Design a protein with these regions (language model features):
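Solvent-exposed alpha-helices and their adjacent loops that cap or buttress functional pockets
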Residues: 19-22, 27-28, 57, 119-122, ...
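N-terminal glycine-/serine-/threonine-rich phosphate-binding loop
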Residues: 1-57
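General beta-strand structural signal in soluble alpha/beta enzymes
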Residues: 28-30, 62-67, 103, 109, ...
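Anionic-ligand binding region
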Residues: 198-224
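Glycine-rich nucleotide/cofactor/substrate-binding loop typically near the N-terminus or early
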Residues: 32, 37-39, 45-101, 224-240, ...
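A glycine- and small-aliphatic-rich helix-loop capping segment at beta-alpha/alpha-beta transitions
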Residues: 42-48, 80-85, 135-154, 177
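A C-terminal functional module that forms or caps the active site or interfaces directly
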Residues: 227-295
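Active-site glycine-rich loop that binds ribose-phosphate moieties when present
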Residues: 110-112, 141-154, 158-179, 212-217
Length: 312
């Protein structure tokens, strides 16, 4: 996918990221939906800038991805990050389906896990850090509400480092879906699937790996064997920032019930649920969300360095 020639009018890679790719330095992709739809301003922009700095301190180059004025951008300026933060929900949330239309219309777009993977792959970036992946929504057996992130993971060669699937989802059905499509679900130093705000859940990952080098080797073997598709690395939230299971589950259950009552569906459901859970937990879930992103950025940096060492 990285060999596809794409017009610079459609895809622009920042000089810093371009230099890293050209000189075979490690790069970590970051998404932008977390900026515009995942947190309130100014915390969203501040967090995004701090996550970039965290990655730089580890050695790799960060590449925040978004659509600005109809251009797919890999590596944003601080001004562009602040624009996405300020505009918030006025910025279109862009998954695979929406991407060509937002670009064609010359609009701004915040990329989800799926569209960030697509653009990262176009640029030749193999490692991506986020908060949590989308998945199968609760009640999907009736609504068929399944995030496009999962299909992207089945098809696109990018490793996604996350704190598991967002705990507002049906974790059991999400793991089943990933298994059906052959997506490895790796637990980093854990056999239990992390549940975003909580370190564990009642579900298991498909394999436990304990080091970034083991993960990098698995990536290289998978793709060199012609096994296309991504890998999910589920990295538990640090213990000191994890939320008590009982209180977070009560908040999630209430938020899900309210979403159903208000008819919130589709791509609006995740931002609604995360915002409502933050309100119901007095902002504690937002603090946890920010910390788990930092934690994932650090692990993604280690994996990117190890992978670059392996493939040269």
């Amino acid at each position: 996918m990285s060999e596809l020639k794409i017009s610079p009018e459609l895809l622009q890679i920042s000089p810093e990221v371009q230099d890293a790719l050209k000189n075979k330095k490690p790069v970590v992709a970051l998404e932008s939906t977390i900026i515009s739809h995942g947190m309130p301003f100014p915390q969203n922009a501040q967090t995004a800038i701090e996550v970039e700095e965290t990655i730089r301190k580890q050695g790799p180059v960060p590449a925040t991805i978004a659509i600005i004025g109809g251009v797919m951008k890999v590596g944003l300026s601080k001004e562009e990050i602040e624009l996405l933060g300020r505009e918030g929900h006025n910025v279109t949330k862009v998954s695979r389906r929406d991407l060509p239309f937002v670009v064609a219309a010359g609009k701004n777009g915040a990329t989800t896990v799926a569209s960030t993977m697509i653009i990262a792959a176009l640029a030749g970036i193999k490692v991506f850090a986020t908060g949590g992946i989308g998945g199968v929504h609760r009640g999907a057996e009736h609504t068929f509400d399944i995030s496009a992130d999962l299909q992207e993971l089945a098809n696109t060669n990018v490793t996604v480092v996350c704190a598991g699937a967002k705990s507002i989802l049906d974790l059991g059905l999400t793991t089943e879906y990933l298994e059906t499509f052959g997506v490895p679900l790796i637990g980093y130093q854990t056999k239990a699937l992390p549940a975003f705000f909580c370190r564990t859940s009642s579900f298991d990952v498909s394999i436990r790996l304990d080091s970034a080098s083991e993960i990098a080797r698995a990536m290289a073997v998978k793709w060199q064997s012609g096994l296309n598709g991504g890998l999910v690395v589920a990295n538990p939230i640090p213990e000191q920032f994890a939320m008590p299971e009982e209180s977070i589950n009560a908040a999630i259950d209430q938020a899900v019930a309210e979403a159903e009552e208000q008819g919130v569906i589709g791509k609006e459901s995740t931002p609604f649920l995360l915002a409502r859970v933050a309100e119901l937990t007095g902002g504690d879930s937002l603090k946890s969300n920010i910390q788990l992103v930092f934690n994932n950025a650090i692990l993604a940096s280690e994996i990117a360095k190890e992978y670059q060492r392996l493939v040269g």
